Amino acid sequence: MVPPQRAKNDTSSAPDSAAETRGPLVSSGSGLGRRKSATARVYLSPGEGVFVVNGRDINEYFTSKLHRQFACQPLKILDLLGSYDVKVTLHGGGASGQAGAVRLGIARALNTIDPENNRKPLKSAGFLTRDSRVKERKKAGLKKARKAPQYSKR
């Protein structure tokens, strides 16, 4: 028996995204992210895409759209944005450091859930690397970490 021919532009049986080739989401995971002086504990569970940060909605917690996008990048590149419920507990730091900590925590949680499919794209995007840059301390005799007071020759 000969299988029926498909039209060239018919993609009904072809997977549309990486999420469809993965199968059903059944596993949960957690990850710890740090950036500057911020620490984020991230818990992922299969769900409708509810994103809660310290008991508040992400839109309420991160008022800047840039910080929200930055925090959600790992889910976006894996095409899992509405697939997991995300619960985050944040401590310390400012908005930028906290967004970076959430991003690292989500990436590590996704890596623990499915390392075979998730590790390579997360690693190539640089989401599994901890950004170790921190503020340099102020030194005695200087105005800031490296800024010296104005010098007068005479």
Curated annotation (Swiss-Prot):
Top-level taxon of the source organism: Bacteria
Keywords recorded for this protein, A-Z: Ribonucleoprotein, Ribosomal protein
A GO molecular-function annotation: structural constituent of ribosome
Residue spans of biased composition, Basic residues class: 135-154
Entry GO terms, CC: cytoplasm; small ribosomal subunit
Region spans: Disordered: 1-33, 115-154
An individual GO BP term: translation
Signal sequence annotation: none
Classification via Pfam families: Ribosomal_S9 (PF00380)
NCBIfam families to which the protein is assigned, alphabetical: PRK00132.1
Family: Belongs to the universal ribosomal protein uS9 family.
Protein name per Swiss-Prot or TrEMBL: Small ribosomal subunit protein uS9
